[in-house]
């Protein structure tokens, strides 16, 4: 069975970069990133590995909602200048790069879903909990910095909803980290309570007459914003990917069946 290790490039690199005392010390960054990737390969023993990078185009989410991710700090200049050399070092390690047009997240999600549907195993290396919406038994998420898999049961308990409701929760309450708005006046706790009762957004919005007047008014006025927020939060899993899986085979990995990436 194919085991595809899919690394969220900037999520890994920027976390490592933030811990380096001298922000111009690209040598230390390169050494630490290579060490991290070597450990990832040793721990997970994948048949295939790729590191996915964000691109420079304006994302479709930003075009749809200009405030999306507003206020995010730009990449530090030393890192921006040293990134190509770092990517070259990873290529020399036989860790191939995939370059997204805009956000890496949708490419990572597409790779994971395609792998899982082909009866392979996908391991996403990222601390971004947005990947938790990829509800498939052959997809897992690894936090390199805490050396553990994302605990979905613990996340469900923390958020107060089931995994199948994560997107509905973000549609109602928003996501401050990504500047996804949600509905004004609806916070995470009240959103979770609503989803416990009504289970899904369609059922909730068809049941406003069962709520108090004030809350029903908020929801009715925010319905379109909830739909927008859902769309912003939802990962695309069907992007056309012009890649060949054999290019990402781990050296010395035994032959496995390929997956269709069309």
UniProtKB/Swiss-Prot annotation:
GO terms for biological process: DNA replication, Okazaki fragment processing. It is an enzyme of class 3 (hydrolase). Keywords: DNA-binding, Endonuclease, Hydrolase, Magnesium, Metal-binding, Nuclease, Potassium. K(+) binds at residues 172-173, 181, 183, 186. GO terms for molecular function: 5'-3' exonuclease activity; 5'-flap endonuclease activity; DNA binding; magnesium ion binding; potassium ion binding. Residues 185-190 are annotated as: Interaction with DNA. Residues 162-257 form the 5'-3' exonuclease domain. Binds 2 Mg(2+) per subunit. Only one magnesium ion has a direct interaction with the protein, the other interactions are indirect. Its EC number is 3.1.-.-. Its cofactor is Mg(2+); K(+). Gene3D superfamilies: 5' to 3' exonuclease, C-terminal subdomain (1.10.150.20), 5'-nuclease (3.40.50.1010). Mg(2+) binds at residue 105. Has flap endonuclease activity. During DNA replication, flap endonucleases cleave the 5'-overhanging flap structure that is generated by displacement synthesis when DNA polymerase encounters the 5'-end of a downstream Okazaki fragment. Belongs to the Xni family. This is Flap endonuclease Xni. It comes from Shewanella baltica (strain OS155 / ATCC BAA-1091). The lineage of its organism: Bacteria, Pseudomonadati, Pseudomonadota, Gammaproteobacteria, Alteromonadales.
């Amino acid at each position: 069975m194919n085991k595809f290790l899919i690394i969220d490039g900037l999520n890994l690199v920027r976390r490592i970069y933030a811990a380096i005392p001298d922000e111009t010390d690209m040598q230390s960054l390169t050494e630490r990133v290579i060490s991290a990737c070597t450990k990832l390969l040793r721990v997970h023993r994948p048949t295939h590995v790729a590191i996915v990078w964000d691109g420079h185009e304006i994302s479709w989410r930003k075009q749809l909602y200009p405030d999306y991710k507003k206020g995010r700090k730009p990449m530090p200049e030393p890192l921006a200048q040293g990134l190509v050399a770092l990517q070259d070092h990873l290529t020399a390690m036989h860790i191939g790069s995939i370059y997204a047009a805009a956000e890496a997240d949708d490419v990572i999600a597409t790779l994971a879903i395609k792998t899982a549907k082909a009866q392979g195993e996908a391991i996403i290396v990222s601390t971004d909990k947005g990947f938790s919406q990829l509800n498939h038994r052959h997809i897992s998420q690894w936090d390199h910095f805490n050396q553990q898999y994302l605990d979905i049961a613990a996340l469900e308990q923390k958020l107060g909803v089931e995994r199948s409701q994560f997107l509905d929760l973000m549609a109602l309450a928003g996501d401050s980290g990504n500047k996804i708005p949600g509905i004004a006046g609806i916070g995470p706790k009240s959103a979770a309570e609503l989803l416990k009762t009504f289970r899904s957004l369609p059922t909730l919005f068809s049941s406003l007459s069962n709520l108090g007047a004030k809350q029903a008014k908020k929801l009715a006025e925010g319905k379109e914003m909830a739909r927008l927020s859902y769309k912003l939060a939802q990962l695309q899993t069907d992007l056309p990917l012009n890649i060949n899986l054999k290019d990402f085979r781990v050296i010395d990995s035994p032959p496995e069946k390929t997956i269709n990436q069309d």
